[in-house]
């Protein structure tokens, strides 16, 4: 669906005029959004020095979220009156890719959904949808010096199920497998 610039609302960065907006999705990767636009000069300075780590950003229309994620890169340039911002953001699944862990899951009867549930309980309001049969692991699962994202991606790859993140969710929503589409 196509939208006009006037229909796009940004939350998290006070963009006055949107110049460029792109979304990128790829199986096995975090969803990504890049945006370029102008802000008031004083807002640009405040963004440059006052934006905390893992700051959220949402791009929406009046009735639909187009992208919701975490700002991973911010560049501010400008003059006395106007600032330009360039933002790169990733889906909230990027929060799962920040800390390496080592642990084991020794219940071989545990299913892949249960394994994902144990990992995701550390991330508030997170969830996973499986587009594959939920089967037992069948062996011990070891996460060694991997982030939670790397570990789940590897585990689901054993079932040939790509792991993706829903980019229009304000929390971590994962999808394992290939969705079935209704024509």
Predicted ranges, named:
Residues 1-102, 158:
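Assembly/oligomerization scaffold segments
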Residues 26, 81-82, 125-126, 169-170:
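Edge/loop elements at the starts and ends of beta-strands within beta-rich repeat scaffolds
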Residues 68-69, 125-128, 162-164:
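Short secondary-structure capping/junction motifs at helix and strand boundaries
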Residues 73-75, 84-85, 91-93, 132-183:
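Short beta-strand-centered interaction patches in the first periplasmic/extracellular domains
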Residues 92, 109-129:
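Glycine-rich, acidic and aromatic/proline-enriched surface loops and short helix-turn segments
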Residues 99-102, 112, 116-117, 148-151, ...:
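Long, intrinsically disordered, low-complexity accessory segments associated with secretion
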Residues 100-109, 138-142:
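Second-shell loop/turn segments in exported
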């Amino acid at each position: 669906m196509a939208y006009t610039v006037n229909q796009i609302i940004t939350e998290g960065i006070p963009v006055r005029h949107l110049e460029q907006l792109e979304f990128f999705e790829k199986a096995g990767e975090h969803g990504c959004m890049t945006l370029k636009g102008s802000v008031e000069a004083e807002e640009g300075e405040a963004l440059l020095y006052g934006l905390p780590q893992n700051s959220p950003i949402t791009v929406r229309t009046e009735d639909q979220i187009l992208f919701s994620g975490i700002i991973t890169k911010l560049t501010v340039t400008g003059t006395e009156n106007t600032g330009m911002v360039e933002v790169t953001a990733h889906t909230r699944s990027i929060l799962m890719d920040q800390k390496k862990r080592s642990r084991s899951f020794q219940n071989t009867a545990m299913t892949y959904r249960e394994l994902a549930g144990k990992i995701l309980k550390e991330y508030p309001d997170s969830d996973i949808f499986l587009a594959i049969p939920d089967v037992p692991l069948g062996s011990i699962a070891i996460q060694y010096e991997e982030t939670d994202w790397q570990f789940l991606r590897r585990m689901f790859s054993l079932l040939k199920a790509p792991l993706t993140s829903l980019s229009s969710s304000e929390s971590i929503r994962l999808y394992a497998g290939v969705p079935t589409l209704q024509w």
